[in-house]
Amino acid sequence: MNDYTQQLQGKKDYLKTLFAGLDVPEWEVYESPDKHYRMRAEFRIWHEGGEMFYAMFEKGQKASGASMIRCDRFEAASEAVNRLMPELIAAAAQSPELKKRWYAVEFLSTLSGEMLVTMIYHKRLDAEWMQAAQALQQQLDISVIGRSRGQKIVLKQDYVTETLKVGNRDFRYRQIEGSFTQPNAAVCQKMLEWACRTAEGLGSDLLELYCGNGNFTLPLSRYFRQVLATEISKTSVSAAQWNIEANRIGNIKIARLSAEEFTEAYTGKREFKRLKDGGIALTDYAFSTIFVDPPRAGIDEETLKLVSQFDNIIYISCNPETLRANLDTLAETHAVERAALFDQFPFTHHIESGVLLKKKIL
């Protein structure tokens, strides 16, 4: 058993133990490549003895020379990131403006190799820095953003455009710097395909909470008459709207509401001008299914009451502990029909999972 298989087996065993006592079918398992799977990576820039290099630090330890790990390569990151790393550091080392007080760097790449690089500084960025960064951008064929306290300088664009293949169709996604995107594109495609398979035959309308940039919304829209998706982040809503238009999808509407706010709107406790302004009338929808991909804290108690009202629940989770806690409640009204482990984060303790629940016939 190699290192990758061994760590994946550990995750399978953990899920079986955690969900013991719940009626859960055999876990479907979706593997990751064992290297070059992360589309995002971030490093400190370490300056020592006239040299400059990428660095990380031992987990749980204060950032210092004693805990520092030099990273000339990073196998977890995409091949595009690994190709760029030495070129970027070498080019920046030749420019006093780029090198001085350069503190950290963030890479955001795509499967096609498009690259956005955010250079973070402990100094004010001026016209000389911009001129040097423009030259760097042109030399390396990348997009550069400069950040410092109170400053964000976008030289060309602050996003990349990812293309993910789901079944027989390609979907284009604008991924904006600083906003959440799934880091493992290969596994993300498997997650999208799994979600679409679970949605087959459910029909009617779909409600999605926590939709982000529309990652799941776009491919799932093919299986429903109408889709209403909610998201609180303005940046993510903007990206989702662009993604809907770019993919020429006509049956999705986005509401900029938190899950808690939508619950209040759905139950009639509050009216929201944002819904009215968006031309959204909840009475126009006949929801058969709800899709949720909540943050690590899971679904709050009031939203869970809302979720339990739907016939079908597709639940993607980045925290199996809160998924288990939520399922303890949902199991009173629903049965788990499918369960999947997605190895989004190889060689870490993090586990991404998905379940399909259907309302019990009492």
Curated annotation (Swiss-Prot):
PROSITE patterns: SAM_MT_RNA_M5U, TRMA_1. SUPFAM superfamilies: S-adenosyl-L-methionine-dependent methyltransferases (SSF53335). Gene3D superfamilies: 2.40.50.1070, Vaccinia Virus protein VP39. GO terms for biological process: tRNA methylation. InterPro entries: MeTrfase_TrmA_AS, SAM-dependent_MTases_sf, TrmA_MeTrfase, U5_MeTrfase_fam. It catalyses: uridine(54) in tRNA + S-adenosyl-L-methionine = 5-methyluridine(54) in tRNA + S-adenosyl-L-homocysteine + H(+); uridine(341) in tmRNA + S-adenosyl-L-methionine = 5-methyluridine(341) in tmRNA + S-adenosyl-L-homocysteine + H(+). One of its GO terms (cellular component) is cytosol. It is an enzyme of class 2 (transferase). The keyword Acyltransferase does not apply. Pfam families: tRNA_U5-meth_tr (PF05958). CDD domains: AdoMet_MTases. Its EC number is 2.1.1.-, 2.1.1.35. The active site is at 318 (nucleophile), 352 (proton acceptor). GO terms for molecular function: rRNA binding; tRNA (uracil(54)-C5)-methyltransferase activity, S-adenosyl methionine-dependent; tRNA binding. The keyword Metal-binding does not apply. Belongs to the class I-like SAM-binding methyltransferase superfamily. RNA M5U methyltransferase family. TrmA subfamily. Dual-specificity methyltransferase that catalyzes the formation of 5-methyluridine at position 54 (m5U54) in all tRNAs, and that of position 341 (m5U341) in tmRNA (transfer-mRNA). This is tRNA/tmRNA (uracil-C(5))-methyltransferase. It comes from Neisseria meningitidis serogroup B (strain ATCC BAA-335 / MC58).
